[in-house]
A protein has these predicted regions:
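Extended beta-strand/beta-hairpin segments
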Residues: 1-56, 67-148
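Alpha-helical metal-binding/catalytic segments enriched in His/Glu/Asp
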Residues: 58-62
């Protein structure tokens, strides 16, 4: 068994090919494995694609930093969800041209100004995934706050 690394310094991932196409099992020290695959004809659609994982990474990065700051502000968060949409280029490399993230929050005391502040902090300082794609992909963030 591998020892857990200090994730603040180094991240180690492993992928293992599971078939004769592009189906991989990926893991990070100490976490459950995930399946990564591509759509036919290259793959069999048996897992997440790399771009889907990027969207999940960006969403969880923004979500983690936003929730951390909202909680430090003593805000109540009853529900929190992020829906992300990536619009792909049609020419190679067929990565994202733009990404839209929508935060859906239920809270009795979070105001738009609070979210504007934590989104700005996430984008400019605290979300490493966003930092890595900045300048390459247009990222927009919308939000919907409900009090019920």
């Amino acid at each position: 068994m591998n020892s857990i690394t200090d994730k603040s310094k180094e991240l180690i991932t492993t992928i293992d090919l599971l078939n004769q196409k592009l189906h991989f099992k990926g893991s990070v020290n100490g976490n459950d494995p995930i399946h990564i695959d591509y759509t036919p004809p290259l793959g069999d659609n048996l897992g997440y694609t790399s771009l889907e994982l990027l969207l999940l990474s960006l969403s969880s990065c923004l979500g983690s930093s936003a929730l951390t700051f909202l909680r430090r502000m003593n805000k109540t968060v009853n529900e929190f969800k992020i829906v992300s949409t990536g619009n792909r280029r049609q020419e190679h490399p067929t990565g994202f041209r733009s990404i839209s993230l929508k935060l859906i929050i239920e809270s009795p005391d979070i105001q738009a100004e609070d979210l504007d502040r934590v989104i700005k902090l996430s984008e400019e300082t605290y979300c490493p995934v966003w930092s890595m794609i900045r300048g390459n992909v247009e990222v927009s963030v919308l939000y919907d706050i409900s009090t019920s």
